From Swiss-Prot:
Example of a GO biological process term: protein transport by the Tat complex
Function comment: Part of the twin-arginine translocation (Tat) system that transports large folded proteins containing a characteristic twin-arginine motif in their signal peptide across membranes. TatA could form the protein-conducting channel of the Tat system.
Protein name, UniProt field: Sec-independent protein translocase protein TatA
Naturally occurring in which organism (per UniProt): Sodalis glossinidius (strain morsitans)
Pfam family, one: TatA_B_E
Listed Basic and acidic residues bias regions: 78-88
Length: 88
């Protein structure tokens, strides 16, 4: 009831052929095939690069954080309050 039958698909295909012509559809099909081939090729190249990069990442470097030194030039909070009182 809600599906598309074979006869409806044939009617749609014949309308598409009449509208676009066989040459244009043939060119469209070859372009689609070439793009799928290129996609598969790039995916296989990506798999090869990830396998070599995983070998490199297995030897991680040891990163150490630099020691945090407290700042010696901090003024006492009492001195800061006294300076504020002098300005008032």
């Amino acid at each position: 009831m809600g599906g598309i039958s074979i006869t409806q698909l044939l009617i749609i295909a014949s309308i598409v052929v009449v509208l676009f012509g066989t040459k244009k559809l043939r060119g469209l099909g070859s372009d689609l095939g070439a793009s799928i081939k290129g996609f598969k090729k790039s995916m296989s190249e990506d798999d090869n690069t990830t396998s070599t990069s995983s070998d490199k990442s297995s030897q991680d470097a040891d990163f150490t954080a630099p020691p945090i030194e407290p700042k010696a030039n901090l003024a006492c909070p009492d001195e800061a309050k006294n300076k504020d009182k002098e300005h008032v």
